[in-house]
Amino acid sequence: MTRDEALPDSHSAQDFYENYEPKEILGRGVSSVVRRCIHKPTSQEYAVKVIDVTGGGSFSPEEVRELREATLKEVDILRKVSGHPNIIQLKDTYETNTFFFLVFDLMKRGELFDYLTEKVTLSEKETRKIMRALLEVICTLHKLNIVHRDLKPENILLDDNMNIKLTDFGFSCQLEPGERLREVCGTPSYLAPEIIECSMNEDHPGYGKEVDMWSTGVIMYTLLAGSPPFWHRKQMLMLRMIMSGNYQFGSPEWDDYSDTVKDLVSRFLVVQPQNRYTAEEALAHPFFQQYLVEEVRHFSPRGKFKVIALTVLASVRIYYQYRRVKPVTREIVIRDPYALRPLRRLIDAYAFRIYGHWVKKGQQQNRAALFENTPKAVLLSLAEEDY
């Protein structure tokens, strides 16, 4: 058993061990390990996040103090948003001189990231459900002046019914009225332009809740395309792309999506934060509203007849399209297999299984970039790197 896999001493964490039995590791962070655990009185399964505030003895006293304060702040925010159906629920907390134990609901479906890896890309319908729930969470957070600062598919969990639960509030903070942030933290490919600018310009006024909306746009783009909107093998060039808002809807996947969904993505990925969509504005976008209207509409007899008539017309059109459609020949498949949607999805799925990573299909597209995000990446010296 490695040091990372070793469990905290049962004597120093007696209260935790009296109530819970830790099991296998589910995930790791820079200074934490997440394990499945069993609540002894009820035999209920939970997930426990074990945070080593000493970094295994490698942290300085100042770093230990900062991590302890950050963990207490995370616990405080989780308690303030407790009860929201799409936010992970904190069940129990335990503290020793060296460790924190945070007990959460166990999400057996795992991360949205893993689901995307399996599915390659998501449909507009699936994306709509996920993004609506995420935006409702962000609305709640922002009304409380809480900014998450680390929104990404890895921090969105799924329950058995495919409902999302936002997790990992380690970078979150509650702003005072008029307060602006300057700390550079987050995951590189999800960073908003103003966060990067803060690291390069001492006179920058700082950033606010708008950074969450940029990350939301990156998430939505990634769910639909299967790859992030901003990527370059050299990180500083990728950060340049972010700062200039240089992205495209150029990959073949976008041919299958509506202009409405592309419009919403573009409303998030706006370089100037004051012009970026808020969560409330996004929920009022036609991408969501057109389906809300349909959900509450009551059918009248006339409406039922109209549906039947349209169904008959659609059936006739499908029949004639079927009679006219050109067969897919061997030559077409050999010449451009990626132009055919079923083959495209099949190729993507098997490429991952064969090579262990997604296959790059263009200069601006690389699914392997999804796997380059290290947990809890803190960027402290962007300004010192060469352009």
Swiss-Prot record:
Family classification: Belongs to the protein kinase superfamily. CAMK Ser/Thr protein kinase family.
One GO MF term attached to the UniProt entry: ATP binding
Domain of life of the native organism: Eukaryota
Function: Catalytic subunit of the phosphorylase b kinase (PHK), which mediates the neural and hormonal regulation of glycogen breakdown (glycogenolysis) by phosphorylating and thereby activating glycogen phosphorylase. In vitro, phosphorylates PYGM, TNNI3, MAPT/TAU, GAP43 and NRGN/RC3.
Binding site for ATP: L26, G27, R28, G29, V30, S31, S32, V33, V34, K49
Domain comment quoted from the record: The two calmodulin-binding domains appear to act in concert to bind a single molecule of calmodulin and are pseudosubstrate/autoinhibitory domains.
Domain Protein kinase: 20-288
Record-annotated active site: D150
GO cellular component terms, semicolon-separated: cytoplasm; cytosol; phosphorylase kinase complex
EC numbers: 2.7.11.19, 2.7.11.1, 2.7.11.26
Keyword Nucleotide-binding: yes
Pfam family, one: Pkinase
Location of the region described as Calmodulin-binding (domain-C) in the Swiss-Prot/TrEMBL record: 343-367
Subunit structure: Hexadecamer of 4 heterotetramers, each composed of alpha, beta, gamma, and delta subunits. Alpha (PHKA1 or PHKA2) and beta (PHKB) are regulatory subunits, gamma (PHKG1 or PHKG2) is the catalytic subunit, and delta is calmodulin.
Name of the protein in its database record: Phosphorylase b kinase gamma catalytic chain, skeletal muscle/heart isoform
Enzyme class: transferase
PANTHER family noted in UniProt: SERINE/THREONINE-PROTEIN KINASE
GO biological process: carbohydrate metabolic process; glycogen metabolic process; signal transduction
Chain residue ranges for the region called Calmodulin-binding (domain-N): 303-327
Key words, A-Z: ATP-binding, Calmodulin-binding, Carbohydrate metabolism, Glycogen metabolism, Kinase, Muscle protein, Nucleotide-binding, Serine/threonine-protein kinase, Transferase
